[in-house]
Amino acid sequence: MNPPGPFEHGGNIHAVARLTGAAPGQLLDYSANINPLGLSVAVRDAVRTALDDIIHYPDAAAAALKSAISRRYGVQPALITCGNGAAELLYVLCQVRRPRRVLLAAPTFSEYERAARAAGAAVSYFPLTAEDGFRLDPDAFAARLAGVDIAFLCNPNNPTGCLIRRGEAETVIAAAARAGAWVVVDESFLDFLPDAADHTCRPLLAAYSNLIILQSLTKFYAIPGLRLGFLLADPAVGDILDRAKDPWNVNTLAQAAGVAALGDDAYRAASVAAVAAAREELVSGLAALPGVHPFPACANFVLARLAGTTAPVLRQAMLRDGILIRDCSNYPELSPAYIRLAVKLPDQNAALLAALGKNLKDGNP
C-alpha cells in the first residue's frame, strides 16, 4: 500500500474554489466533518474581545485553556498538553517517540500514518472489513502488538463511524502495556455522542501510563481555521512533548475561543441533539437512493458504499452542483466504491440528497 499523498483530506474548500472559480461561500462542503451549527455566539464574542491581546505573545502555559479543559473533561491540568490542532500534537508525539513500527486499524484518519512515516516508522494495517461492519476485534488487534511501538485507535472511527467500547479499548491498552507500546486513542468525534462519558478512555488514564488520548476541538466547535486540540497523557509524556513543541504553539485567539467554547453547555447540548436528528434523516434519505448503502453512524458523518458508479465520478458530478463530498478511494482498505458525507442541517441535507438523486439516476452521473 502506498503512503498517503501530501494532502488528501476533505475540507480543502479553498483549493476547490480556485479550481472552479466559485467563492468558498458558494460551495456546500460535505467533505469536512464540522459541526453544522457553526460558530457559537460565545466563541464569536470571545475572539472579538481577544483581538486587542494579539499585540502580546500568547500564554505559553495556556493556563486558562487548560483550566477550561480540566473542568469540562474532569481531568487534572498536569495531564493536558495543548496544541495547534490535534494534528500538531500527533506529529510531535511521533517525533519524540521515534517509533520503528506502528499499527493502525484501517481504514482510519490518514494523519496517523503520515505522522508515523515522517518519523521514520514502518506502518502495518489491521484491516476493518465491510462484512464485519468495520467493527474492531480487540483481541485480534491486541494479538498484532508484538514489535509495535505505537498503536492508533480512532473512536468513533473516521471514516467508518464505528464506536469502540471502553472495555474493548482497555483490552488493547492492557495488551500494549505488556508489549511496551503506546496506544493513542483519538476521541475527536466522541463529543457528538449523547453518551460520550460512557465511552471515553479518560477513566483509564490513571491505570495505564501507556495511554494517550488525542482530541481535536475544531470539529465539535466549528473552528478548524483557528486550529485547536489537546492531548491527555501521563505527566512524564507531557513533559517530553512540552520540550519538543513550539512554546507559543496555541495562539491567543484560539485560546480565547477554546475557553469560551468549553464553557458553553447550551451550545454543546444543542449540537448533540441537532446532529443526532439530522443524521437519522440523512441516513434514511441515503438508504432510499438507488445504489447507495449507508453504514450505521454515531457521529457527524456517514460512510456509504456505492453501486453503479464510483466515488471519483460522483464527486466530479456533485462538484458541478457546487457540493463537495469525500471520495474515500485513498483510504487503505477502502475502494472507489466508498464516499463519506458530513451531517449538516436539514435544508442542506435535503439539497445534498436531491443532487445525489439527480446524479445517481440511471447510475450515470
Predicted stretch roles:
Residues 25-26, 76-80, 101, 180, ...:
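Short acidic capping loops at alpha-helix termini that bridge into adjacent secondary structure
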Residues 55-101:
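Phosphate-binding glycine-rich loop
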Residues 96-115:
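Conserved PLP-anchoring active-site segment centered on the Schiff-base-forming lysine
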Residues 167, 320-321, 330-365:
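PLP-dependent enzyme catalytic core of the Aspartate aminotransferase-like
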